[in-house]
Amino acid sequence: MKNKWGRRIGVFALAAISSALMFSTNAITAKAADNEWTYSYTGGVQSWTVPYNGKYMLEVWGAQGGNDTHNSGGLGGYGCGKIALNEGDVLYIVIGGTNGYNGGGTSTDNHDAYGQMNIYGGGASHIATTNRGVLANYVSNKSEVLIVAGGGGGAGFSSEGVYRGGYGGSGGGTNGGNGGSMGEDNSIPGAGGAQNDGYAFGRGASLGGYYAGPGGGGWYGGKSGYNRSGGGGGSGYVNTGKLTDGSMANGVRLGNGYVKITALHTHTYTSKITTNPTCTKDGIRTYTCTGSATDAACGHQYTEIIPKLNHDCSVVVPLGTKGYEVPGRPGYFYTRKCS
């Protein structure tokens, strides 16, 4: 278990996140740092158990839609929000795939004149408080979904030497982007999903009329169009009843989807410790301090919660200081709370 109280991070701007993380990865679940956990595409449900009470940032990226020979599928969307969680809570994570996993539409029964086959809408990525599998299974339990990033729409099919299929719409974001037309009057692009409208909850449309591309998965999936147009991207979603500071963006993710969870703890010290701690087996250290005119917080007993790790319980706090750093973790400090 990680340090329960000693976390300090900075939250960087959405634009920086979006640009820095526009990459593709097929890696399985990994732990990126002591205060963050990352999840990549696996084709199934993954889970994360909250290690300690506190506030966390949830970030999700949807998958890119499939490419045609001449045009690209829409990039996956992005969403983020903050949530207070308790130790032992479990969140369930599903990462969208470029193969349509988690709601992307399919077009496996068609191919273009160049042999391009199997264009899919990108799958959505979501985090929920229960395990019901793919997003579409929450249609009667939407309140259990915390956050969604839409998948990009698939490109329309091309015709050799004559027509080029339209590009896929970007994944959401509040709304998914519309697909692109192939330029003919009767080419109708697929519409992107919205907050309360789209092809279907959790699912993008499969192949539309006359070689149109499929829709991306999302809160509401993108629609397919007509005559080689691109499919619409799926919409994203932030559950504002449970998350704060929500934000979404369109079209920032190449390849499969992605999820990152970051601890947002920040702790400061308000008083000096004037006695060395006494260690106890249960991991609680107790401090006392004497009152003074310059240290109003003194006169109380302080306790320090020691994480269940192999830290040396004999390490003492230097007298007259505000505490000591976590062994081997410069810049990270144990937090003391007034009892």
Predicted regions, residues:
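Bacterial N-terminal signal peptides that target proteins for export
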Residues: 1-13
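Sec-dependent signal peptide cleavage junction
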Residues: 21-34
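Bacterial N-terminal signal peptides
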Residues: 12-24
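Short tyrosine-centred short linear motifs in exposed loops/low-complexity segments
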Residues: 41-46, 52-56, 89, 280-283, ...
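A recurrent domain-boundary module in secreted/ectodomain proteins
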Residues: 241-264
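GGW-centered surface loops in extracellular recognition modules
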Residues: 33-67, 140-141
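Secretome/extracellular-domain signature
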Residues: 73-178
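Extracellular modular ligand-binding repeats in secreted and cell-surface proteins
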Residues: 264-339
